[in-house]
């Protein structure tokens, strides 16, 4: 093995590998700290929903969301969104006239007015996509947090929904799985380690797995 190859492997092992390892361990420690400081399973009820499990409150969204708390911490949480609707025979879902700090009540078609033959759309027409701008839902009240939901299809887009219907979102937060960010950190660390000085190919050649290219170069010279 020539001097240049020895220098590259020495530089990678002595300088880049420890730094990459320290970076990976640091990110992992930050993740463990966020897990220890994460809140337990939290239920953010909207509009006084008393029951969020059942046919009246179907699950409309499930995914991950970053909760940014007023202390500056950012915690990855698993978010379950249930959409509860009020019907004439619905006695389970109750809508509060005095919403608390952590409530969000979406009045379907609240800012939309269409008049055909003097009838408001809130009394007559079916909901359309533009009448239900639910692409982003912000919830306040959980440690001054705000949660942005992307591509959330509102249940008010149901075929039988009317613009006069009141829809409440029930958001349930729980700590995210540990493996998601951990594997991401490991992947970044491994890619960063392998991006310097052809680290993996040099290790493979030193172990005899790959042929040494410099032998052919020396013979040709």
Curated annotation (Swiss-Prot):
The gene is UL40. GO terms for biological process: symbiont-mediated perturbation of host natural killer cell mediated immune response. Keywords: Host-virus interaction, Modulation of host NK-cell activity by virus, Signal, Viral immunoevasion. It holds the Pfam family UL40. Plays a role in the protection against host NK cell cytotoxicity by up-regulating the cell surface expression of HLA-E independent of TAP (HLA-E has an inhibitory effect on the cytotoxic activity of the NK cell). Also promotes cell surface expression of UL18, another viral protein involved in NK cell evasion. This is Protein UL40. Residues 1-35 form the signal peptide. Belongs to the HHV-5 UL40 protein family. Residues 15-23 are annotated as: HLA-E-binding epitope. InterPro entries: Herpes_UL40.
């Amino acid at each position: 093995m020539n001097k240049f190859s020895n220098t590259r492997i020495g530089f990678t092992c002595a300088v880049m590998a420890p730094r990459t390892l320290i970076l990976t361990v640091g990110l992992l420690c930050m993740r463990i700290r966020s897990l220890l400081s994460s809140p337990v399973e939290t239920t953010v009820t909207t509009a006084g929903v008393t029951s969020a499990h059942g046919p009246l409150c179907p699950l409309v969204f499930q995914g991950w969301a970053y909760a940014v708390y007023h202390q500056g911490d950012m915690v990855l949480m698993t978010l379950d969104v249930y959409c509860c609707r009020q019907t004439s025979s619905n006695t389970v879902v109750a809508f509060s006239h005095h919403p608390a700090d952590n409530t969000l009540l979406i009045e379907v078609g609240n800012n939309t007015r269409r008049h055909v033959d003097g009838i408001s759309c809130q009394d007559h027409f079916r909901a359309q996509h533009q009448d239900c701008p639910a692409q982003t839902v912000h919830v306040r009240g959980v440690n001054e947090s705000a949660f942005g939901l992307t591509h959330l299809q509102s249940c008010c887009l149901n075929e039988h929904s009317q613009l006069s219907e009141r829809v409440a979102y029930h958001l349930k937060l729980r700590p995210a799985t540990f493996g998601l960010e951990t594997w991401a950190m490991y992947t970044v660390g491994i890619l960063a380690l392998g991006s310097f000085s052809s680290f993996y190919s040099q290790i493979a050649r030193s172990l005899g797995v790959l042929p040494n290219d410099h032998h052919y170069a020396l013979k040709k010279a």
